[in-house]
């Protein structure tokens, strides 16, 4: 059975805790990717073209006998309109709102993906492969006192003491303007993910850590593959509270 050191708010060890069986799950990157992509696909907003886009013209064909293509042309000229190969014409097969863009995943596969992603958080090689910067040893298990933090400076102080604050700096410096049209569609910046803090129950810690770059706070019951493996890449730098470890016993089976 794997054990982990429990660290207090000062970063000092205050004992050990046995990790649940879920932390010994085999690494399944294929299922993790499948679960994350399924979650992303299932929250897509339906989209489609305007019903009469490209059709609002009185263009009509000249018919045969003129030595030109029999395509719809505007009435006061010879410019082609309406058809897909014409400038400003309709699309041949436009996207439709009724299209089903969801992706299904079996329940057992989904649970296995979450278990595998949880186990990946204590694999130092996988955590480093994601690009995270830290000086302490994984896994990180914090005393329940962290759930009582209500100010961002208190959270920063804890992360510095635990040797995790370098990853916050990495996430802050990694923010950059997105390439392409997305920058003018409400998603101008691409942001990095840093530390995930998993608590036993809802607390004010989520508000205290809300403004730290890339930090997410979630209860153990709200864990999913996307939180544990952003971008389908497992091994997120994760801080577990003592109560989260205790409450996890028997979950995700």
UniProtKB/Swiss-Prot annotation:
The answer, when asked if RNA-binding is one of the entry's keywords, is yes
Q: Which domain of life is it from?
A: Archaea
The transmembrane segments are none
| Pfam (any one) | Ribosomal_L4
GO MF, one term, reads: rRNA binding
What GO terms describe the biological role, i.e. biological process, of this protein?
translation
Q: What does the entry list under GO cellular component?
A: ribonucleoprotein complex; ribosome
Say if the entry is tagged with keyword RNA-binding: yes
Q: Which UniProt keywords apply?
A: Ribonucleoprotein, Ribosomal protein, RNA-binding, rRNA-binding
User: Which purpose does this protein serve, as stated in its record?
Assistant: One of the primary rRNA binding proteins, this protein initially binds near the 5'-end of the 23S rRNA. It is important during the early stages of 50S assembly. It makes multiple contacts with different domains of the 23S rRNA in the assembled 50S subunit and ribosome. Forms part of the polypeptide exit tunnel.
Name the protein family.
Answer: Belongs to the universal ribosomal protein uL4 family.
Q: Which NCBIfam families match?
A: rpl4p_arch
Q: How does it assemble?
A: Part of the 50S ribosomal subunit.
Descriptive protein name: Large ribosomal subunit protein uL4
Q: Which organism is it from?
A: Methanococcoides burtonii (strain DSM 6242 / NBRC 107633 / OCM 468 / ACE-M)
Organism lineage reads as: Archaea, Methanobacteriati, Methanobacteriota, Stenosarchaea group, Methanomicrobia
